[in-house]
């Protein structure tokens, strides 16, 4: 929720050079895409990890880079994941608007949609994680998702199936003995 509040605030109140983008990792809410679309700012989806958009940050090509853990970096302010910056920005937003976070998020969902986002961590073994990494995307063609067609499949960082109005990602953690399952509709 915090990432959406921050992005809406930045795009609606700050000036950025033309050609900048918003970057989010593969596991991060697509509600950010809807906010970016409203302001005609392209969205860039990367694998998990700030290293995948560090170059664009250093060259001031991103308004914001973020991941689902609420790590964020902002144009010309930081070049790595920074939770303290997010807290300060949220304090600025609440002070400027006179609204608390629940009011600000209520405005977001009223404007864009109510996303149903969920992450589940499944304890696993190294062998099971390796099996996930070896799944061939071609074996998933023709499956349905959320009652509709799968419109795209991405396998660079786990397996992500994109439906018409939803997505699901199965991703072995790179740091813990778990498989992370993400879904949003």
Model feature map: region roles:
Residues 1-11:
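Cysteine protease catalytic core and zymogen-processing segment of caspase-like enzymes
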């Amino acid at each position: 929720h915090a990432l959406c509040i921050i992005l809406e605030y930045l795009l609606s109140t700050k000036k950025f050079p033309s050609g900048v983008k918003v970057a989010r990792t593969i596991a991060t809410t697509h509600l950010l895409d809807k906010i970016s679309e409203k302001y005609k700012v392209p969205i860039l989806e990367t694998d998990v990890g700030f290293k995948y958009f560090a170059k664009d940050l250093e060259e001031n090509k991103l308004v914001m880079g973020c991941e689902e853990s609420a790590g964020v970096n902002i144009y010309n302010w930081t070049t790595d994941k920074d939770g303290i910056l997010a807290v300060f920005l949220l304090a600025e937003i609440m002070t400027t608007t006179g609204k608390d976070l629940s009011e600000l998020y209520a405005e977001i969902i009223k404007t864009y949609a109510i996303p149903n986002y969920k992450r589940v961590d499944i304890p696993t073994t190294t062998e099971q994680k390796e099996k996930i990494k070896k799944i061939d995307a071609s074996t998933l063609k023709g499956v349905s998702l959320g009652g509709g067609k799968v419109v795209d499949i991405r396998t660079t960082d786990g397996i992500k199936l994109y439906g018409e109005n939803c997505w699901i990602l199965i991703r072995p953690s790179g740091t813990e003995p778990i498989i992370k399952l993400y879904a949003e509709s």
